[in-house]
Amino acid sequence: KGIVDKYVCFFYLRPTSRFMSEKSQINKKEEILFSAAKVLTNKGYYSSTMDDIVVESKMSKGAVYHYYSSKKDVYLAVIDMWEQRTQLLLAPAAEEESSYKGLKKLFQLLVKELKMDGSFFNCLPTLWAIARHDDDFKKSMQRVYNRFQKFVELIIIRGIENKEFVKLDPKISSLSLILNFEGIFWFSIFKSKDVDAESYIDQVSSYILNAYMLKKGD
């Protein structure tokens, strides 16, 4: 529960005209960002324009520019929204009593999201490529990566403390898992006739997590 509290907080608000107006603005911004993610995936960063995002969003140019002044602002906001959505998506994994089950669920939730909407997964390789040449993108992507690694690390630490996992380096172990998480992203780009994302991640996660498990008598 403590891990979840660090990532998710729900506020129950009584509906008001101001609240509804703010909610409408959030919905519009999300529509713009989802559209931007599609444009970024299809055209890349340097070949895409604000006009492309306007067309994809089916909003007026004024509406888009009301929230974002440039394509760089939009794409940086895409990273922020992806991080927020991922935190909410993965929160149930930290609620599992077993760290093993929690990490397995982590993989499963990512695969489920990929199947439902691969928009953000599709543009991740492009965002990493931009980060190599732009410090602002690098800082944003590094922040997302660091928080995600810490989230995984906390679940592993709990497993060690509960004597569910052997004594291992939590940072290295979390990195190992994350490198395999990234394998999911490639299923959003390259299609395989023989292996699907769900089968791949289930088998790979089992291999890794079984190596972490504390065996009886150890």
Spans of model-derived segments:
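Generic hydrophobic, amphipathic alpha-helix propensity
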Residues: 28-37, 53, 78, 82, ...
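Hydrophobic alpha-helical segments that form the core
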Residues: 168-187, 200-208
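N-terminal intrinsically disordered/low-complexity leader segments
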Residues: 1-27, 216-218
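Hydrophobic alpha-helical connector segments
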Residues: 77, 91-119, 171-177, 198-201, ...
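Amphipathic alpha-helical segments used for helix-helix packing
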Residues: 102, 114-139, 189
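Helix-turn-helix
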Residues: 31, 38-73, 77
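Amphipathic alpha-helical packing segments from all-alpha helical-bundle domains
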Residues: 87, 91, 116-119, 135-162, ...
